Amino acid sequence: NEQYRSVGGRAVGGFIMMKSRRRSAEKGKKMHVGEIMTADCANGIGMRVTVFVSGCRNHCPGCFQPETWDFDYGKLYTPEMEDELIKELSHPYYDGLTLLGGDPMEESNQEGLLPLLQRIRRELPEKNIWAYTGYIYERDLVPGGRKYVEGVTDQYLDLIDVLVDGPFIEAQKKITLNFRGSTNQRIIDLKETRKTGTIVLDPLNN
C-alpha cells in the first residue's frame, strides 16, 4: 500500500518510526525529526503528510508527545529525507503537509524547514501547508518577538497557509474542537493575516 511507505524510517500502520536518540539540546544543532506520519487525516484538512520536528521550549502540561521536547530526539534531518518527503507528498491523494512537533517555530526548526517549504511551493504548488505552534503569532512571530529570526521568519510564514497557534492548556481541553486541543488555540488563515496585517481566523474555528 503506497500510503504506508517509509520516509527516512520504518513504516508501521501509517507512521514512520524514528529511532530515538535522547541528548540535551545544544544551540546551533541541526534539525532533528522525531516522526513522519503518512496518510494522516487528523492534523489538517484532507489526507496529509505530517512531520513531527524535534525541540520545544514550551513544555505544556499534558503534551501528547513530551519526548519531542528534546532537540536531538529522533533522526537528523538530511537532504535524502527531504527528497523522500517530496516524493511521498507528490502522490495525488495528498492534500498537503502539516508541521508539528516539538515546535516548528523554534528558531532552528524554522531554519531547517524553510528549504523544504520553498521546494514544495516550487515543485508541488497545489499542496497546502499547515503548521502548529505553542507560540502566539502576534506576540512571538513578528519583528521583536522571541521566535522571530531576521531573514527567516517572514519568508517561512509567507509559505504557510494555516497556522494553529497557542499553547495547549489542559484546563481548556475540549475533544470536539476542530484540529486543536484546547479552546485558547486558534486556527489562523495565515495567508489572509499576512495580507491584511490583522488576525484572520479560519472558518474551522468552532
Report residues per predicted region:
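P-loop/Walker A phosphate-binding loop and immediately adjacent motor/lid segment at beta-alpha junctions
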Residues: Q118-R121, K173-N206
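Low-complexity, intrinsically disordered or signal/transmembrane-proximal segments
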Residues: Q3-Y4
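Structural recognition of alpha->loop->beta junctions
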Residues: G144-Q172
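Residues embedded in well-ordered beta-strands within globular domains across many folds
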Residues: M37, T98, D161-V164
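N-terminal pre-triad scaffold of radical SAM enzymes
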Residues: H32-H59
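Conserved Radical SAM active-site core
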Residues: R22, G28-G34, M47, Q65-R146, ...
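Residue-identity detector for glycine
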Residues: G8-G9, G13-G14, G28
